[in-house]
Amino acid sequence: SHPARPDEGYRDGEPAKDLFPADQLADHFPRLRIAAPLKISDQPRVAAGSRPPFPAPDQPSFYPKLRTMLIALLLAFTATINAQTLKTVPYRWKSVQMVGTGFVDGIVFHPTAKGVRYARTDMGGAYRWDPKANRWMPMLDWVPFQDLNLMGVESIAVDPTDPDKVYLACGTYTNRTTPDGAILRSSDGGRTFKITRVPFKFGGNENGRGNGERMTVDPNAPQRLLLGTRHDGLWRSDDGAVTWHRVDTFPSTGGARGAGIVVTLFDPASGKPGQGSTHAWVAVSDAEGPNLYESKDSGATWAPVPGAPSGLFPTHMILGDDEALWLTYGSSPGPSRMNAGAVWKLKDGNWTDVTPEKGSFGYVAVSVQEGKPDTAIVSTFGHPEHEQIFRTTDGGKTWRPTIGGKETYDYSKAPYIAHTGIHWLFDIEIDPANPNHAIFTTGYGGHETFNLTDADKGKPVIWHAMATGIEEAVPLQLLSPTKGAQLVTAIGDYGGFVHRNLDKPVPEGNFINPHFGNTTGVAAGDQAPDTIVRVGVPSGNSRAGNIGYSLDGGKTWQTTKTAPPGARNGHIAVSADGKIWIWSLSSAYRTTDMGQTWTPVTGLPSNPRVVADHVDPNLFYNLELFGGVLDTSRDGGATFTGKSFTLPGGLPHRGGDRMDARAGQDQLYPTPGKADDLWIAAFDGLYHSADGGGNFTKLPQVEQLHAFGFGKAAPGSSVPALYLVGTIDGVRGIFRSTDGARSWAIINDLAHQWGLVLQISGDPKKFGRVYVGAHGRGVSYGDPK
């Protein structure tokens, strides 16, 4: 088997300070990213009785290190020349407060250290709890674009003997085109990480992502870890996750319809500190064959646990203080649909079915109270009435429901969830340091209570929104109106918000009337910013309509009287005076009476994306980038005329690292404050026309682009500030120009990269303010320091 290799270190996104020469170079060139040589202490090494690392080093050699150092220095020299043309403007970054807006699929408490806990998400990184700030803190904002796969976190493990050590198994998808995953290890509570690349993939955003935990630390030998994978079997590390080797004696990789190995667990009572645990269990997502295995010889051999249930997929497993093993099961790994489930308990070799309630739903999580092993809670998935949390105080003999009765909810920290049904409770945890404190996760974040034991007294349990600091939205469009609200966000799954205070959750919640799932387009008139129009698709089974508009800057909303036939999703353009709206679908439709009537637009190809000029209310455009045609309307969008154009160096080609078609690349951007002034933000370059598209010039420094936007002009300047996400002069980052793209300044640092950035927009009301929308990491806003 091929062991994993350690290769990189990060400190809040910066190269680790003990890696030469990256430490010295990073001090002088903060945007420079160098693949630093391995530390000697991190070199793969051969353990007795194991297969040698691949490639197997015969002896330590000076020459590979020298070669690596020379390459790094050459790269640094090249980057130095490029960096001389780029200024750096330090920015202060904060998250726009939406709170949650995505699936938190796992919570991990440290078993002995009070206040130490972590949260993982399916595509938005991982978080550590900060008890002083009383909020979650992102741990992976340093992840660069080239490593965006690491933003999906498959599993988290903590060292029971050291509250500062935490491990993350990172990787979003297991498909053929996605890179292999990595194990991130930290010795300071997730503030800094070192990376070990592994020769297999993780599926942080795939079916079964709420199962777990797949990775665990031996409490009696904390340098030893077990890791379950989706398709590549069981892996083990004996050096604190620096190197990994496949456990070839483990007999299963998981069923064809399952999610691989979903839980690994050591038995602390089977060993002594410093000697290691001899007994361990592994649960496999398999409903057709054996799905629970154990080893009683420190992992040398494995065998199915006698009498274990079959026919369902294990979802969670936990060991109580009394050596009782609790498991939950469903008819799928989830969050695909479940129509059956069970809860089982193994104690003293005897299996007992302790399912609280049978039905056409599954069970997905279980937690046992520290010090009281007969007290446990379990959560359901797919319950026909509403999701449920059952609680027992007698080891599963009897259960009481805790949802749908006397409980109350405090939505003040995330008002939008008041009308978002509780769903996807794939983890539920009782705080080992406080039996009154429990957390359950959801598709929008989660809830926590501080009076859980009141349920045993028949008193109401109060559940509070618990996701402050966690921001998982996928921004599909960002709008900063010329006056009024600071920002309007169009996001996936939860519609979007009108933000008047970026540092507090929106008190009225997300968009309603209509309430969208995905908002795919939002626009306002530059000269009439109180007129805001949004399009998308309603959430759930709602029939509220696929378009909403506001005439008071987003304070209130209403639906149009009519809509084009079959209209849903698409994009919306609003004329500069707010009176003409054009809805781009498979074809385009136009209204001049706020949606009472719609007429087809003529002269456009299929699947257009019409945009409005920011000055002339009768002027609209549509870009056919790959065909080299610019469609223009000067009659208020009633008819369009196409005209061919050329670009210096030729038209762009499809393909490349575009990553997500919803990003702001390959689009046309009319300039605020100037009619007939256009920018093409293509993936492979930035182009400008000052004559309505008659002629385009290419901006020479821009090599690659993912997002583009405008902001308020700098003091004394007549041109709007430009903001760009991409690569300029060989440097990848977030950039600002205040002189019409003649020069650029870098405005982000290595601690703020957010994986894949989809959208960027400046603020027309405040110079320097910029909004950055990242894939699964919400929206951040920046101001110059």
Model-predicted segments: where are they?
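Beta-strand-rich domains and repeat architectures in extracellular enzymes and scaffolds
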Residues: V96-G124, P432
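Signature of short aromatic-glycine-proline-rich micro-motifs recurring in repeat-based ectodomains
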Residues: G102-G106, L150-A157, G208-R214, G258-L265, ...
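Short glycine/acidic-enriched loop and turn motifs that connect beta-strands
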Residues: G124-G125, T172-T177, D232-G233, D286-G289, ...
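Conserved Ser/Thr-centered positions that define the repeating blades of beta-propeller domains
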Residues: R128-D130, P160, S186-S187, S237-D238, ...
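Surface-exposed loop and turn segments in beta-propeller and other repeat-based domains
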Residues: D141-D147, R197-E206, F250-G254, P401-H419, ...
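Conserved blade-ending motifs and adjacent loop-strand segments that build the rim/top face
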Residues: F361, Y409-Y416, A465-L478, N513-T520, ...
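Loop/turn-rich, solvent-exposed surfaces of beta-rich toroidal or solenoidal domains
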Residues: H423-H437, T441-G446, P670-A690, F696-G740
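Blade-level signature of beta-propeller repeat domains, shared across WD40, Kelch, NHL, RCC1
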Residues: G755-K785
